[in-house]
C-alpha cells in the first residue's frame, strides 16, 4: 500500500482525511504533521510516496521550496476539507503512483526518470487541451512537481511540415514518437527565461510551448516574447532538416496570458 504524509494545521482537513477509508483506496492511514519542520522531520524518518499539503500560503511556499531541494520528485497532493474531494484527489494520486512504479522500459529507470516521463504525458494532455480547467492545470503541475510557472505569460508556436511529407503517416515506424523525441532533444533549450517544450499531437500537430520557470525573473516584456523566441526556433528547425530531412516551418505563434489558458474550458 502507498504511504501518504498530510501536512496541515487545519482541523477540518484533518477530519476529512480521517474519515476516508484509505485501505480501500490502496493507501495506509496517512501520517500527519502540523508544521513545515514536522513534515520534513517525518519525511526524513519515515518513507512517504507522496505528501498532501494544506498550510497557510507562506508556510506552503516554504515547504514547497524545501521539498524542491530535498525531495524534488515527491508528488504533492492537494488537501481539501471535504471527504469526497479528498477521495477524488487520492484516486488521482494513486493513478500517478501506479505510473511512477510501472515497468515501462528495459532500462533501469529511476524515480526521477519515471517522473519526467509522466510529467511529459501531463504536458502533452495540457497542450492537447484535454485538461478541463485552469485550476486542474495548477493542481496537475503541483502533483507532478513541475518547475514551470502556470501563472505567467507563455509562448505557443505551431509548426507544420509540407503536405507531401509522409514522415508521420508511414515513412517511419513510430514516426510521431521518433519526431517528438528528436524535437525534445533539439528544442530543449532556454531563451530569455523561457524553457521550451515540444509535443507531437494527434492530427499531425506539432506544438512548441515556451514558459517561465518558478523563481526565475522574466527577461522579456509580453509584447516581445514571440520575436525573441522565433530566432532560436528557426535555428532548431534548420537542425531538424539537417538531421531528419523534415522541412518544418512556423505556422503560428502567439502569447498566452498563462499556462492556465490552455485548459479545455478556455478553448470554448
Predicted regions, residues:
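Interdomain helical linkers/hinges and coiled-coil/dimerization scaffolds
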Residues: 84-208
Amino acid at each position: 500500500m502507498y504511504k501518504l504524509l498530510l501536512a496541515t494545521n487545519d482541523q477540518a482537513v484533518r477530519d476529512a482525511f480521517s474519515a476516508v477509508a484509505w485501505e480501500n483506496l490502496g493507501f495506509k492511514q496517512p501520517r500527519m504533521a502540523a508544521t513545515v519542520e514536522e513534515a520534513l522531520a517525518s519525511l526524513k524518518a519515515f518513507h512517504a510516496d507522496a505528501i498532501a499539503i494544506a498550510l497557510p500560503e507562506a508556510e506552503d511556499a516554504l515547504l514547497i521550496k524545501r521539498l524542491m531541494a530535498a525531495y524534488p520528485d515527491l508528488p504533492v497532493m492537494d488537501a481539501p476539507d471535504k471527504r469526497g474531494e479528498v477521495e477524488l484527489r487520492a484516486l488521482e494520486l494513486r493513478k500517478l503512483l501506479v505510473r511512477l512504479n510501472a515497468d515501462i522500459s528495459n532500462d533501469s529507470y529511476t524515480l526521477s526518470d519515471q517522473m519526467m516521463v509522466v510529467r511529459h504525458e501531463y504536458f502533452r494532455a495540457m497542450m492537447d487541451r484535454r485538461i478541463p480547467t485552469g485550476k486542474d492545470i495548477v493542481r496537475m503541475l503541483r502533483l507532478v512537481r513541475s518547475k514551470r510557472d502556470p501563472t505567467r505569460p507563455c509562448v505557443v508556436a505551431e509548426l507544420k511540415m509540407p503536405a507531401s511529407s509522409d514522415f508521420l503517416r508511414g515513412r517511419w515506424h513510430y514516426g510521431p514518437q521518433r519526431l517528438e523525441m528528436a524535437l525534445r532533444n533539439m528544442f530543449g533549450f532556454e531563451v530569455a527565461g523561457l524553457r521550451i517544450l515540444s509535443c507531437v499531437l494527434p492530427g499531425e500537430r506539432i506544438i512548441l510551448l515556451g514558459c517561465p520557470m518558478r523563481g526565475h525573473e522574466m527577461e522579456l516584456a509580453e509584447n516581445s516574447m514571440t520575436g525573441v523566441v522565433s530566432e532560436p526556433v528557426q535555428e532548431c528547425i534548420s537542425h531538424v532538416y539537417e538531421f531528419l530531412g523534415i522541412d518544418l516551418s512556423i505556422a503560428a505563434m502567439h502569447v498566452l496570458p498563462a499556462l492556465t489558458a490552455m485548459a479545455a474550458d478556455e478553448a470554448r
